[in-house]
């Protein structure tokens, strides 16, 4: 059964990091890569059991710090829907062999409601797909998971 690490790049996200971490129940590890926050982002993340690494000046594949090969990349402004959470629990029950990546839909908050955006690559095997600046390279061949990521913009 595959294990899953959530990778979240942060900077001064103390007010919203809790929401995304609470939605990541299918993940076995939370890895926060912090970019010099001056607020309580690191303290809040650690309260949720997250491991914290620092972004630093050099380019680096921060996925190397993860304990697992499968990485779910999310933003602090996002959260999993219940449908995506259920899909990830189901996903963890299956071995994925040569799979490289999986895609998810995005629903973005606007002043007029929620907009559906095209699916993006967010769940990747770090040994097969590169992750730069906290997000994976787009892989249109990845299978689409049920559910969406909610992106909170307001």
For each predicted feature, which ranges?
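A conserved acidic beta->alpha catalytic loop
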Residues: 23, 34-46
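N-proximal low-complexity "stem/linker" segments adjacent to membrane-targeting elements
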Residues: 1-23
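Catalytic-site signature of metal-activated, phosphate-bearing donor transferases
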Residues: 59-64, 68-74, 78-154
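Conserved donor nucleotide-binding strand/loop of the catalytic core
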Residues: 42-65
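A short acidic, amphipathic alpha-helical/loop segment
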Residues: 19-23, 44, 61, 86-87
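Short beta-strand/loop segment that forms part of the nucleotide-sugar
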Residues: 8-9, 27-37
